[in-house]
A protein has these predicted regions:
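Short, well-ordered helical secondary-structure segments
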Residues: 6, 29, 138-140
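Hydrophobic helical h-region of N-terminal Sec-dependent signal peptides
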Residues: 6-13
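C-terminal motif of bacterial Sec signal peptides marking the signal peptidase cleavage site
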Residues: 15-18
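Acidic/polar, low-complexity intrinsically disordered N-terminal segments immediately downstream
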Residues: 20-104
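Acidic/His-rich structured neighborhood in mature extracellular/periplasmic domains
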Residues: 85-186
Length: 186
C-alpha cells in the first residue's frame, strides 16, 4: 500500500509541475554555413533549386556536415567537389538523375542538402599491417550515399566527362538508389 501511495504522489507531482503556462515558440531554423557559397552561375541555379524544392546544394562542406547524424555512425568519407567540375557535375545530376522524379516527389522526399563531392568511399579492414605497424585499409568507392539529412553525390571530378555509357548508367542507378533510400527512411 505504501508503494501505491508513493507512486500516486509522484504521478500527481509530475502532473502538477508539467502544466507550465509558458508559450510554446518554434526554435530558429538551423544554419549550416554560408549559402550560396559563391557567385558563379551554378550558385544562382542552386539558389533557384533551393527556392523551388527547399534543398541546399553545397560543394564546400565540412566533415561535420557530412557526418551529421543522430542515431548512427556513417561509415563513409567524402572529399569536396573539384571546383572546375562543379558545373558539369550539377548538370549531370540535374539532367540525368533529378529530372526523372516529379516536382512533387522532390519537394516531399529530398533531404535538406545535396553535397557535391569529388569522391565518396568507405574503408575496408584488410587485417594487414605495413612495416610501421599501421593497419592497411582497402578503399571502396561509392558514387552516392544518403545520410540523415543529406544526399552526397561523389563523382564531381574530372573523370565525370570521360565515363562510358554503362558507367553513367551505373552512376545514375547509384544516385536513384540513394534517393529512394533516403525517401523510404523518412
Amino acid at each position: 500500500m505504501k508503494k501505491f501511495i508513493y507512486l500516486m504522489i509522484c504521478l500527481l507531482s509530475i502532473g502538477i509541475y508539467s502544466c507550465g503556462e509558458d508559450d510554446l515558440t518554434p526554435s530558429e531554423p538551423m544554419t549550416f554555413g554560408e549559402f550560396p557559397q559563391g557567385d558563379a552561375t551554378y550558385d544562382q541555379e542552386f539558389v533557384e533549386f533551393y527556392n523551388k524544392y527547399g534543398v541546399q546544394v553545397l560543394y564546400k562542406f565540412s566533415e561535420a556536415d557530412f557526418r551529421w547524424n543522430i542515431t548512427e555512425y556513417i561509415p563513409y568519407y567524402a572529399i569536396e567537389a573539384e571546383s572546375n567540375s562543379i558545373e558539369d557535375g550539377w548538370s549531370f545530376l540535374k539532367e540525368n538523375c533529378l529530372s526523372i522524379w516529379s516536382d512533387d516527389f522532390l519537394r516531399k522526399f529530398m533531404p535538406y542538402r545535396i553535397l557535391l563531392g569529388s569522391e565518396v568511399y568507405s574503408l575496408k579492414d584488410t587485417y594487414q599491417y605495413d612495416d610501421e605497424g599501421n593497419k592497411i585499409y582497402q578503399k571502396i568507392p561509392k558514387k552516392a550515399i544518403y545520410g540523415l539529412n543529406h544526399l552526397t553525390f561523389g563523382a564531381v571530378n574530372g573523370r565525370l566527362s570521360s565515363l562510358s555509357v554503362s558507367e553513367k548508367k551505373e552512376l545514375i542507378g547509384e544516385i536513384a538508389f540513394a534517393i529512394t533510400g533516403y525517401a523510404t527512411s523518412k
